[in-house]
Amino acid sequence: MRKITGIIVHCTATHQDWWNGKTTSAKVSEVKKWHTRDRGWSDIGYHFLIDRDGTVAKGRPIERDGAHVSGHNKGTIGVSLFGGQGSSADDNFSDNFTSAQDASLHDLIDRLQSTYGPVPVTGHNEYAAKACPGFRVGAWLADGESEKATGFADIIAAFLSLFRR
């Protein structure tokens, strides 16, 4: 089993009603096509994907390094939320995602940290000049939607959130 050192949150950058009515499995298959056919990767880049209704789907096997943040895939788990098209890194979670996704993401993080220990949880936007996942993960973890922290404050907030659960 590989050593897990962190969880990195992403978004698929799809419109809120993208493939509305399609199954989560069909959506995951489409993302896998984007990653394998269009980018030439060996598999889908994310380990987990969370649909708009809160359904959590498995992607790449967790035993294998992902393909979700250049230079930071080794030891990390990639989790992607469906949605986020047109988002900003300074948006609130609820600006782009559903309450069902919120609950599922919290639950998945709790389960992963129960298995792998209190590893840091960060957003793609902390490693690259991107909006993804469309909110500040540290602020979301620390106190939901009440403030928008940036940079170092996100890291401190994420660290402190480990002791609040």
Please place each PLM-identified region on the residue numbering:
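Short secondary-structure junction motifs
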Residues: D43-G45, P118
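Charge-rich, low-complexity N-terminal segments
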Residues: V31-K32
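Aromatic-lined glycan-binding groove of carbohydrate-active enzymes
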Residues: R39
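Basic/polar, cationic surfaces and motifs that engage anionic cell-wall
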Residues: M1-G21, S25-A26, R52-R165
